[in-house]
Amino acid sequence: MIDEVRELGIYTAYNANVDAIVNLNAEIIQRLIEEFGPDKIKRRLEEYPREINEPLDFVARLVHALKTGKPMAVPLVNEELHQWFDKTFKYDTERIGGQAGIIANILVGLKVKKVIAYTPFLPKRLAELFKEGILYPVVEEDKLVLKPIQSAYREGDPLKVNRIFEFRKGTRFKLGDEVIEVPHSGRFIVSSRFESISRIETKDELRKFLPEIGEMVDGAILSGYQGIRLQYSDGKDANYYLRRAKEDIRLLKKNKDIKIHVEFASIQDRRLRKKVVNNIFPMVDSVGMDEAEIAYILSVLGYSDLADRIFMYNRIEDAILGGMIILDELNFEILQVHTIYYLMYITHRDNPLSEEELMRSLDFGTILAATRASLGDINDPRDVKVGMSVPYNERSEYIKLRFEEAKRKLRLKEYKVVIVPTRLVPNPVSTVGLGDTISTGTFLSYLSLLRRHQ
């Protein structure tokens, strides 16, 4: 499978950012408390800021996360705080974040034949985190040119940095007279949410070359629609950017009917979620999501009872039923679902791949994820041997049993539904981007297996 996958060309867009990681210790935490004062922090904690406008908002929410030991994410809405964070903290590591960024680096790690990555903003700090071998499309003298992404950066482009503060169980610090011990390990994420970086689009000068890019590749993986806003200060809105997103898809397919996969991510705003789902899904061939995202989508399609059942009981039969509804209502080719214990495909009976081939495709996805979890990254196609040696998770027999029961209960005559247990690494080096890794592996293997039927 790996050799066939490497023969493919893939285009990926739109979202990439810098993940800057700080490993917190008692000294760093105490320094922050002394700088702002325990009384001010306690008062701000009582107000419980839901976004970060100034440093005190950050310190108060960080202390709350440390006291509870719960992972949390709070949006940073003041762009001027970039400088304060960069002066205050020494980052232990910086790595690529955002689905399109992570996926591009996975593709080039597998030595896929051609990897073209596009993000509307490419500042130098971001460009340097992409791996060697990734191409970025630019327009020079009214011609399309593919440049190494590291040299294609633009001075002055806005930067999206998500700052991840890792904390460890047992860390002790003082907040005034109160001694606090962190009860659980976790992370506190400060996610950048500025208007300047929320315009998910292909720039006008490049857009007319999308049919040419489509001819160069076998498939495209698109993501980042969750970054769109309902309204913008210049009068534009979500509808404007979704119209442009649909035009991008049409243009990519104009000269060559390439397969397009959308990697969905949770969208908290119900109105925006409905707009993205109804506008984008019917335009593409493949969609990837987890079971919670199935429930979120069902709720905006009018199936709130089934959505509630998925949230409450997490049963395979409900996930299958929900997946079939999404596939039919939004009329695309194949749905890929990734959960901690299993991966699933739902497609129509006339799909050219057999159920055995679909299972092989899913298995390739879980092999890639196990490889990344074991090694922290994928830098060579031979790395996948590590993932192949990871056994299926301990619930795999139970999952197969539940799946057989679900098949007896549901009417599946018009569908092909297959499930493969995941390969779980007991002590993963990294868990970041595992869903993106699964979707990359399943989509690549799906494309390569379809080629056999052409």
UniProtKB/Swiss-Prot annotation:
Domain ADPK residue range list: 1-452
Cellular component, GO, one term: cytoplasm
Catalytic activity: beta-D-fructose 6-phosphate + ADP = beta-D-fructose 1,6-bisphosphate + AMP + H(+)
pH dependence text: Optimum pH is 6.5.
Involved pathway(s): Carbohydrate degradation; glycolysis
Function, as annotated: Catalyzes the phosphorylation of fructose 6-phosphate to fructose 1,6-bisphosphate using ADP as the phosphate donor. As a phosphoryl group donor, ADP can be replaced by GDP, ATP, and GTP to a limited extent.
Protein name: ADP-specific phosphofructokinase
